[in-house]
Design a protein with these regions (language model features):
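Conserved GNAT acetyl-CoA-binding A-motif
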Residues: 120-133
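A short, internal acetyl-CoA/4′-phosphopantetheine-binding micro-motif in the GNAT/acyltransferase core
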Residues: 95-104, 133-134
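Conserved acyl-donor/pantetheine-binding loop and adjacent beta-alpha core of acyl/acetyltransferases
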Residues: 68-96
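Short amphipathic alpha-helix that is part of the acyltransferase structural core
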Residues: 2-42, 62-64
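C-terminal "cap" of GNAT-fold acetyltransferases
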Residues: 4-7, 154-167
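Conserved acetyl-CoA-binding loop-helix of GNAT-fold acetyltransferases
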Residues: 99, 105-118
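Conserved beta-hairpin
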Residues: 52-71
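Conserved active-site alpha-helix within GNAT-family acetyltransferase domains
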Residues: 133-153
Length: 167
């Protein structure tokens, strides 16, 4: 049986402390290919600047998770974001979520999604995201289906494939 993990979830924006930003960047890179790789901390800053709603998870002064989300009408140049922009008038798009491997299976991802879901409900928005199907991310697909998401499409790219989900 796993021990309980004490953690706190905090909202953040582009003005986040550089130490926290650095930890988020390294956690992102540790979680590729489940999340897209970023070439630099500056790329992460630009991503956050374009985003709408973001949270990080901290335990014992260490960032152990994060989620970055966008609303409609962003200038974000992601093909996956553009898919939902064409499909939905208003939406909340989860661009990336990452949990440190050591802290998975403690409900942290679910709690981040519950925060996002609360915002979506308050604003009458669907939550949209994509999950890799090549390379296959079975755990994330199961997580999203268990959380009530339905697959609404898929896309093949030159180096990977994704399934699109909506709740």
């Amino acid at each position: 049986m796993k021990e309980k993990v004490e953690y706190n979830i905090h909202k953040f924006s582009n003005s986040v402390d550089s130490y926290i930003l650095e930890q988020i960047y390294f956690l992102n890179q540790e979680n590729t290919p489940e999340v897209g790789s970023l070439s630099s901390i500056k790329d992460l800053q630009n991503l956050i600047r374009l985003s709408s709603i973001n949270y990080y998870v901290i335990s014992q002064d260490k960032i152990i998770g994060f989620i970055i989300c966008f609303r409609e009408h962003s200038t974000y140049d992601s093909e996956n974001y553009k898919f939902f922009s064409k499909e939905e008038r208003n939406f909340l798009y989860v661009d990336r979520i990452a949990i440190s491997h050591k802290y998975r299976r403690f409900g942290i991802g679910k709690n981040l999604y519950l925060k996002i879901e609360s915002i979506a409900i308050d604003n009458n928005l669907p939550i949209c995201c994509e999950v890799n199907t090549d390379p296959l991310n079975k755990i994330s697909i199961k997580f999203h289906k268990d959380f009530g998401f339905s697959e609404i499409g898929n896309q093949k790219f030159h180096d990977h494939s994704v399934a699109y989900f909506k709740k």
